[in-house]
Amino acid sequence: MSESPKPADALRTLPERAFRARARLVAGVFCLVCCGLAVRLLFLQVLGGGWYTDRALGQQLRDTVVPADRGRVYSADGVLLAANSSCWTLRASPREMPEDKLALAAKGLAEILELDEGKLLEKFSDRRSNDCLLRYRVDRAMADAVRDFCEANGITGIRIDQDSKRWYPQGEFLASVLGFTNVDNAGVSGLELKYDDLLTGENGVVLTAVNAWGYTLEQSYETERFPTEGDGLRLTIDANIQHYLENALGYAVKEHHVAARAVGIVMDVNTGAVLAMSTTPAYDPNQPRVLADKAAREAVEGLSGDERAAALQLAQQTQWRNKAVSDLYEPGSVFKLITCAAALDTGAVSKNSSFYCGESISVAGTRFHCANHKHHGAQTVTQALENSCNQSFIQIGARLGKEAFCDYFAAFGLRAPTGIDLPAEPKKSLYYTADRMGPVELASCAFGQSSKISYLEMASAVCAVVNGGRLMQPYVVSDILGPEGEVIDHLSPVCKRQVLKEETSRTMREMMEAVVLYGGGRNARIAGYRVGGKSGTSQKLDSADEKARIASFVAVAPIDDPQFLCLVCLDEPHSWTTAGGSLSAPVCAEVLEQTLVYKGVPRAAVPDTPASDAETSADLPEDGDSFDGA
């Protein structure tokens, strides 16, 4: 028989049991903690390892972007138009700068960098900062001056990083077509914007090992991915022809005091290639925010505050705009070529159809007359074009009819963008559709008023008039180039549609030559070359100045074998006349003669003009467009 425990033994087992219980509890908690840590370690090592690795690398490595050069741009004849130049960006790391030299650094660098000394000292005094920008894209001289100053005075913590910026070696040359880039080297306007994706290269990067405070380690780790230059462009623009156009336009703008800039376009009539394009005055794309036009600059300088800022912005946007592509205008009597071609093509008239021009003509209660109320009397269609007779073209438009007129207006590409590879084309021109066109609207549209189209649309349409009736898509880039100048892609001419019969085009060439030989285009004659053309002097119907005019002329040579077209428009000239045949025709003649000689087109005999043809410019038929409400 077993003995029961003694009271002393029982008392001893109670604390032992409590101890064992506590030990088991502690062991259990310890096991749970270990399990938790194990799970956490598993998460950190396996599931979250990539994230923490990235964080660690981000703290241990500093990446410095190495900017890629943009692709270079060349003219058709190999002139470099847009390239890249080295520059330097200056940054400071206040943590690394010696504290006893902050004031000296602020004073010296403020003087070199043309910055505020107080603001620099404030930046340098922020010891928490490891990176602050001092100056963006300075030239070599300024970068060298900063380097010399820091070395001479034992100033550390100033970083000089090499960078790249866009450079236009020809200055203002072709500025409105090329456009320019912003501080980030991204295209803002012109070809720089249109082809930005192609021109932009792929940046490189340098990875450098740093310590916990962001300082570069003495025994540094560094790896580099080299930048890749963007693709280049070869243009259809010929630098020589562009030079001829810009020189002639610049002289005309000054001579005739052109208030609202001038436009010039030279095209290959058979391909649609733009050989030259200018908006004058131009600007320097190396300094695009500096107003190049003296009058605009003086107007802005006379203002202050918000008014000055708004005026400056408007003036800058105006000088950047490629007027040849982006602006709409009333083409005036140059448009009579379109009306005439459409009427001939449909058979509504022949070149010998007769019309009468009296004192005036009334259409639905509105009375129209020719410039200076001239009476041309009875005349054929050819003579009406020579004389730029409004009354005759009102009658031609009526015979054509509004439906056919609107159909040809669209067929010539005057309702929609041309599709040129330049930005900022208007989405649509201003015109009447057949359902909105009454007799008065048809009458005024027939001689080139009441519709607004772009200068490029007008030039493109006239190319179709003379090249056999084919509407070609204008373009300015012929080749995409690789970094070594090799051709990656070639852009071929595009024919959008056939607008006229070949016979109609041939007849129009004959009539346009008659305009230059016997009519309002005599100032476009070129010795030894056969030239066809048409003048225009259009009212600016949306201008507050009732006397505001656009003097224009379009010329094609050689007209018997069409190759080159030149359109010149002077917007608001203030000269002895505003007639396009007097002001713009000589500019076309100068540009085309130089172009023909440069291209090796031989001179030949031209048809004789009548012996009595001894008129001066003042005697030329005027082509002003005028109508009065009855």
Where are these regions (language model features)?
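Periplasmic/cell-envelope proteins involved in peptidoglycan metabolism and beta-lactam response
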Residues: 1-303, 319, 328, 403-413, ...
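Beta-lactam-recognizing serine transpeptidase/beta-lactamase-like catalytic domain environment
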Residues: 2-10, 82, 211-224, 237, ...
